[in-house]
Amino acid sequence: MTTLLDPSSRSLVFAVFSVFVVICLMLCVVTGADEDDRALVRSDSRRLRSWQQGIAMGGDTTTVATVTVLVGMVATSGFDGLGVMLGSLIGVVLLLVLVVEPLRGHASLTAADVLDARGSGGPAVRVSWGVVTLFVCFPLLVVQLVVVGNVAAALIGQPGARTGCIVVIGCVMTALAVSGGIRGTGVVMIAKSAIALPVLVVAAVLVLHRFGGDLGRLLDAAAHGSGRGEAYLRPGGYTGEGWVGAVNRIGQTCGMAMATLAMPAVLMRAIATKSPRGARTVGRWMLGELTLLYGALAVVGVGAAALVGEALREAGPAAQVFTPLLLGRALDSGGLLVAALACVLFLTALAAVVDVTLAAGIALGRDVLGASGTTGGTASRWSAALTGTVSAVVAVAVADWNLVVVSTLWLAVCGAALAPVLLYALYWPGFTARGALWCLWGATVLSVAALALSPYASGAPGSILPGHDFRIWDVTIPGLVTVPAGFLLGWLGSVTDPRRAAGGRAGSGAEQGTGDRLNGPRAAHR
């Protein structure tokens, strides 16, 4: 696993990637926003159309971890990997039905502005939302940088180059986020989708062609290649058996759906949607793109189990990140497909990190630091630069950790803390600032505690501290507990708020006029 490409293919990959980075940087500079805070965050309706917004939002939900980890999970675990994809698609549907249209066209710049407009905000809620958003964005950024650093080092054939790869790629991606704003990063996201989706579809077609288009043959070969036999087609390969497996599977689907609904980068683009018709166009393009993408990833994952399953078992869990590249080498010994798939991984990481860095920078600059106007634009850019730099440093420090732990952390916090607050603010008139604070902080602490006391933290070979054992339960995906707890905390904090009992919402009535635009889809047609 030290090298995946011959020298000629390696040169092709980095030549193509370098050209694409230069083009993306130029596009970000040309199409990016000026120093105005609103231009930095919101998309100019004449420069980014609804179908483009839909493609960009679909790209926001597709990180490099999605491509590598999901394909690896399908290859090694079968049914459970497909369950993760199902949870993500459910989250996209919920996002389009419940969130995009109520948010569209509002004067807000961030989701914290929505809470203010609904009367459930305030300075404490704004800062808390910003801090929890950063808590979600940092692990997500770290995962992307570590994955792409590992892949780059393997392609070079020098594992010791991983640190340098993480730092260089982190700097490039931070520069793109700072220079482009949401419009410029949208162009990068669209360009990534235009390249990644066709390559993955071609890989899926080649897999099907290898087995004569017979799905039965493909599944039989995958079951044999995975080493699990018929168990490959049943749940439990990743989530476990018995009641623990059931809790993990339900929590996996529930947590993935809620986290997809509330991803900060996705909300940033949802706010910029222009009209009900534009929201529907965004939804069609986003759902179509992701359905095609996940279908291709599922076929690629099953194909990897069939063709390189033995190599994956011998290499261990750490090799899952290289699954698409190993499959490419098995399908095309000439190296062209490996080169194309490597470019897809680089470009997916590039686009994801750029957008998440921008979302984190805006959360820090506007929500936490409270900057606005021209000052806000400058503060958000400097915050994005700081976020990218810190993420690269942290990625280097935790590069040897189990990345599934880091991924589960941001998914758990996003699904249990951000999603309930957003949905309550949009659809429950009785939601108050106290409820928002209880949900944001309570669900975040509960999510961290649930993972800290699980086998991900200690007591297992792949845990962060394998030499210690302070786990109190065997559940590794706590969504079944944390997501309902987040909703419960938001409800309990609101109904026990003395200011609500006194006859008003805890935010203030000053913004009731603007709140009507956020009362949900029905308000738009009154």
Regions flagged by a language model, labelled:
Residues M1-R526:
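Membrane-embedded helix-loop-helix hairpins and adjacent transmembrane boundary segments
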